[in-house]
A protein has these predicted regions:
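Conserved AAA+ ATPase small/helical "lid" subdomain
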Residues: 60-88
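Conserved Walker B catalytic segment
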Residues: 1-12
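Short regulatory helix/loop adjacent to the ATP-binding pocket of P-loop NTPases
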Residues: 19-35, 47-52
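Structural recognition of the conserved hydrophobic beta-strand(s) that form the central parallel beta-sheet
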Residues: 10-16, 37
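Conserved small helical "lid"/interfacial subdomain of P-loop NTPases
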Residues: 38-58
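Conserved nucleotide-binding/hydrolysis micro-motifs of P-loop NTPases
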Residues: 17-21, 41-44, 169
Length: 179
């Protein structure tokens, strides 16, 4: 508060974890902050910036690039060059998984987490259940409880690595039965 009294300024706290403003920090700031969740670019936003780097690229080529690299704004600074972009995205992934997920949640089996993350990323847009992942891992001689799978997915969601999309085709008690 002394900064705001002595200086006419705004203070920004950034982070890649939903728990950042939970607990003590939220209590200290109580009512004096506004939270903004910022997502990667939509395709329309990506296209606008991509056109500054590749002005003659077709919409189809731009969309393919968007599907391949995603919508992280900094990629434009790398001129969408494949190798630097892949390295940048790999570094973000390692930072989020290792710092925000493994350390914050004290995960001991990092290999299991990496396998679950790879599965979820490889199955974007498809419906799956934690029990089916646990059964598959059991067939690979890795015993894991469905609750552990759910917890790992929850931790990744809290770190903004995943975004859960709720099913819209369920009604009534079917919603309660879905995991």
């Amino acid at each position: 508060n002394s900064f705001r009294i002595e200086l006419d300024c705004d203070i920004y706290i950034t982070g890649s974890n939903a728990k950042l403003l939970s607990g003590e920090l939220a209590t200290v700031l109580g009512g004096r902050y506004v939270e903004f969740t910022i997502y990667p670019f939509s395709f329309a936003e990506f296209l606008e910036l991509y056109r500054t780097v590749e002005p003659v690229a077709s919409d189809a080529a731009a969309f393919q690039q968007y599907l391949t690299l995603g919508g992280m704004p900094y990629l434009a600074n790398l001129r969408y060059a494949p190798e630097p972009c892949r390295q940048y995205l790999h570094d973000i992934y390692n930072s989020v998984v290792l710092n925000d997920v493994v350390r914050r949640n004290k995960i001991r089996d990092v290999d299991l987490l990496a396998r679950i993350v790879a599965y979820v990323i490889g199955n974007i847009g498809t419906t799956f259940a934690s029990t089916s992942i646990a059964k598959f891992l059991k067939s690979e001689h890795r015993t894991v409880a469905p609750e552990t799978v759910l917890n790992y997915i929850k931790y990744c969601t809290e770190a903004y690595l995943f975004y859960q999309v709720n099913r819209e085709d369920l009604q009534g008690k079917q919603i309660l039965a879905t995991n």
